[in-house]
């Protein structure tokens, strides 16, 4: 998995040199950023159940047909609601993985690469997940650098689905 730090080390190594002072300063900046990312990941993980539940409800409120239509892709029954929560949880986990990794690598490799095919195959609307991610962004309760870090990956996921 590529991160900004592994990229810098890889480039320097391929050129047979030590990291430059600028690259080292970037690394120190990344470590400061990592602290905020870890704080955000911890907070999102501890609030995951309530964020997922609220995000699912936001989807049902904006798209009421999702709870009225029958079928395996809708939330008309508890099984459908459980699937919806599971899928929202998957997006939230990807955000926390990115926060820990310090880059979009986990989301790029494990989610974005096949999301169009998954949504098409299972007849899932990206707009459902966009709404869920917007809810999480508006309600995660983070502030400062932790919020900035979390919001950047939430926005990345929203843009990938748009």
UniProtKB/Swiss-Prot annotation:
GO terms for cellular component: phycobilisome; plasma membrane-derived thylakoid membrane. It comes from the Bacteria. Keywords: Antenna complex, Bile pigment, Chromophore, Electron transport, Membrane, Photosynthesis, Phycobilisome, Thylakoid, Transport. Its main location: membrane. GO terms for biological process: photosynthesis. Contains one covalently linked phycocyanobilin chromophore. The keyword Manganese does not apply. Coiled coil: none annotated. It is a peripheral membrane protein. (2R,3E)-phycocyanobilin binds at residue 84. It is found in: Cellular thylakoid membrane. Belongs to the phycobiliprotein family. The alpha and beta subunits exhibit high affinity for one another and form heterodimers. These heterodimers form heterohexamers of 3 alpha and 3 beta subunits which, in turn, aggregate into a heterododecamer consisting of 2 heterohexamers. This is C-phycocyanin alpha subunit.
């Amino acid at each position: 998995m590529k991160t900004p730090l592994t990229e810098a080390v890889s480039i320097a190594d391929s050129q047979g040199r030590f990291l430059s002072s600028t690259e080292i300063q970037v690394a120190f900046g990344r470590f400061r950023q990592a602290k905020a990312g870890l704080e955000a990941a911890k907070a999102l993980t501890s609030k995951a159940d309530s964020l997922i539940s609220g995000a699912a409800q936001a989807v049902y409120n904006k798209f009421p047909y999702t709870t009225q239509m029958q079928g395996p892709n809708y939330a008309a029954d508890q099984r459908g609601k459980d699937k919806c929560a599971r899928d929202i949880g998957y997006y939230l986990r990807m955000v926390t993985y990115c926060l820990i990794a310090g880059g979009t690598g986990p989301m790029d490799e494990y989610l974005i690469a096949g999301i169009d095919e998954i949504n098409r195959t299972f007849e899932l609307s990206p707009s459902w997940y966009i709404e869920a991610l917007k809810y999480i962004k508006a309600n995660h309760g983070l502030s400062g650098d932790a919020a900035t870090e979390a919001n950047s990956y939430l926005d990345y996921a929203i843009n990938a689905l748009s």
